[in-house]
Curated annotation (Swiss-Prot):
Protein name, entry field: Nucleoside diphosphate kinase
Protein's gene: ndk
Major site of localization recorded for this protein: cytoplasm
Chain residues that bind ATP: 11, 59, 87, 93, 104, 114
Localization annotation: Cytoplasm
Cofactor: Mg(2+)
MF terms in GO: ATP binding; metal ion binding; nucleoside diphosphate kinase activity
Amino acid sequence: MAIERTLSIIKPDAVAKNVIGKIYQRFEDAGLKIIAAKMVHLSEQEAGQFYAVHKERPFYKDLVSFMTSGPVMIQCLEGENAIAKNRELMGATDPKKADAGTIRADFADSIDANAVHGSDAPETAAVEVAFFFPGMNVYSR
Protein backbone atom coordinates (compact mmCIF):
# COMPACT_ATOMS: atom_id res chain seq x y z
CA MET A 1 0.00 0.00 0.00
CA ALA A 2 1.19 3.48 -0.81
CA ILE A 3 1.61 6.34 1.62
CA GLU A 4 -0.09 9.31 -0.02
CA ARG A 5 -0.82 12.93 0.70
CA THR A 6 -4.10 14.64 -0.07
CA LEU A 7 -5.56 18.08 0.41
CA SER A 8 -8.67 18.51 2.52
CA ILE A 9 -10.67 21.69 3.00
CA ILE A 10 -13.35 22.09 5.63
CA LYS A 11 -15.63 24.57 3.90
CA PRO A 12 -17.28 27.70 5.38
CA ASP A 13 -20.56 25.93 6.19
CA ALA A 14 -18.87 23.27 8.34
CA VAL A 15 -16.50 25.80 9.97
CA ALA A 16 -19.55 27.91 10.92
CA LYS A 17 -21.17 24.83 12.51
CA ASN A 18 -18.09 24.38 14.74
CA VAL A 19 -17.48 20.77 13.64
CA ILE A 20 -13.77 21.02 12.76
CA GLY A 21 -12.80 18.79 15.69
CA LYS A 22 -15.43 16.19 14.82
CA ILE A 23 -14.14 16.05 11.24
CA TYR A 24 -10.50 15.87 12.40
CA GLN A 25 -11.45 12.96 14.67
CA ARG A 26 -12.76 11.07 11.63
CA PHE A 27 -9.50 11.65 9.76
CA GLU A 28 -7.45 10.36 12.68
CA ASP A 29 -9.78 7.41 13.39
CA ALA A 30 -9.27 6.36 9.75
CA GLY A 31 -5.48 6.39 10.19
CA LEU A 32 -4.86 9.69 8.42
CA LYS A 33 -2.31 12.09 9.89
CA ILE A 34 -2.76 15.86 9.68
CA ILE A 35 0.70 16.99 8.59
CA ALA A 36 -0.12 20.63 7.81
CA ALA A 37 -3.10 22.80 8.71
CA LYS A 38 -4.22 26.41 8.67
CA MET A 39 -7.39 28.45 8.91
CA VAL A 40 -7.78 31.12 6.25
CA HIS A 41 -10.43 33.36 4.79
CA LEU A 42 -9.84 32.89 1.06
CA SER A 43 -9.82 35.94 -1.17
CA GLU A 44 -11.80 35.88 -4.39
CA GLN A 45 -8.50 35.64 -6.27
CA GLU A 46 -7.27 32.65 -4.21
CA ALA A 47 -10.56 30.76 -4.54
CA GLY A 48 -10.70 31.59 -8.25
CA GLN A 49 -7.18 30.29 -8.82
CA PHE A 50 -7.76 27.15 -6.77
CA TYR A 51 -10.99 26.28 -8.60
CA ALA A 52 -9.78 27.51 -12.04
CA VAL A 53 -10.37 24.01 -13.44
CA HIS A 54 -14.11 24.74 -13.08
CA LYS A 55 -13.97 28.24 -14.62
CA GLU A 56 -16.19 27.34 -17.59
CA ARG A 57 -18.73 25.42 -15.51
CA PRO A 58 -22.07 27.08 -14.65
CA PHE A 59 -21.48 26.76 -10.88
CA TYR A 60 -18.02 28.42 -10.85
CA LYS A 61 -19.09 31.90 -9.66
CA ASP A 62 -21.32 30.46 -6.94
CA LEU A 63 -18.50 28.15 -5.82
CA VAL A 64 -16.01 31.02 -5.55
CA SER A 65 -18.58 33.14 -3.73
CA PHE A 66 -19.34 30.34 -1.27
CA MET A 67 -15.67 29.54 -0.62
CA THR A 68 -15.01 33.20 0.22
CA SER A 69 -18.11 33.58 2.43
CA GLY A 70 -16.25 32.69 5.63
CA PRO A 71 -13.12 31.05 6.96
CA VAL A 72 -12.06 27.58 5.82
CA MET A 73 -9.80 25.04 7.49
CA ILE A 74 -7.22 23.64 5.08
CA GLN A 75 -5.16 20.56 5.87
CA CYS A 76 -2.79 18.14 4.21
CA LEU A 77 -3.52 14.56 5.20
CA GLU A 78 -1.03 11.69 4.94
CA GLY A 79 -1.51 7.95 5.19
CA GLU A 80 -2.06 4.65 3.41
CA ASN A 81 -4.22 5.37 0.35
CA ALA A 82 -5.03 8.80 1.81
CA ILE A 83 -6.85 10.06 -1.30
CA ALA A 84 -9.35 7.19 -1.53
CA LYS A 85 -9.70 7.00 2.26
CA ASN A 86 -10.52 10.72 2.51
CA ARG A 87 -13.00 10.52 -0.36
CA GLU A 88 -14.71 7.59 1.35
CA LEU A 89 -14.92 9.58 4.60
CA MET A 90 -16.37 12.59 2.75
CA GLY A 91 -19.15 10.73 0.95
CA ALA A 92 -20.94 11.73 -2.25
CA THR A 93 -20.79 15.38 -3.37
CA ASP A 94 -24.56 15.65 -2.89
CA PRO A 95 -25.21 15.01 0.81
CA LYS A 96 -28.63 13.55 -0.05
CA LYS A 97 -26.78 10.78 -1.91
CA ALA A 98 -23.99 10.37 0.67
CA ASP A 99 -23.88 7.18 2.71
CA ALA A 100 -24.94 7.45 6.35
CA GLY A 101 -22.00 8.18 8.62
CA THR A 102 -20.00 10.12 6.03
CA ILE A 103 -18.91 13.70 6.67
CA ARG A 104 -21.29 15.10 4.07
CA ALA A 105 -24.26 13.02 5.24
CA ASP A 106 -23.68 14.23 8.80
CA PHE A 107 -22.61 17.86 8.33
CA ALA A 108 -23.46 19.16 4.82
CA ASP A 109 -26.55 21.17 3.92
CA SER A 110 -26.64 20.93 0.12
CA ILE A 111 -24.68 20.00 -2.98
CA ASP A 112 -23.17 23.52 -2.84
CA ALA A 113 -22.65 23.83 0.93
CA ASN A 114 -21.25 20.31 1.16
CA ALA A 115 -18.88 20.69 4.13
CA VAL A 116 -15.60 19.44 2.66
CA HIS A 117 -13.31 19.30 -0.37
CA GLY A 118 -10.84 16.51 -1.05
CA SER A 119 -8.35 15.86 -3.83
CA ASP A 120 -9.56 13.30 -6.36
CA ALA A 121 -6.27 11.85 -7.68
CA PRO A 122 -2.53 11.81 -6.90
CA GLU A 123 -1.81 14.43 -9.58
CA THR A 124 -4.44 16.87 -8.33
CA ALA A 125 -3.44 16.20 -4.72
CA ALA A 126 0.16 17.24 -5.46
CA VAL A 127 -0.98 20.45 -7.17
CA GLU A 128 -3.55 21.29 -4.48
CA VAL A 129 -1.18 20.64 -1.55
CA ALA A 130 1.50 22.80 -3.20
CA PHE A 131 -1.06 25.58 -3.79
CA PHE A 132 -1.74 26.01 -0.07
CA PHE A 133 1.40 24.54 1.54
CA PRO A 134 4.81 25.22 0.05
CA GLY A 135 7.07 22.22 0.79
CA MET A 136 8.67 23.80 3.82
CA ASN A 137 5.30 23.87 5.62
CA VAL A 138 4.44 20.15 5.42
CA TYR A 139 5.84 17.78 8.04
CA SER A 140 5.59 13.98 7.84
CA ARG A 141 5.30 12.43 11.27
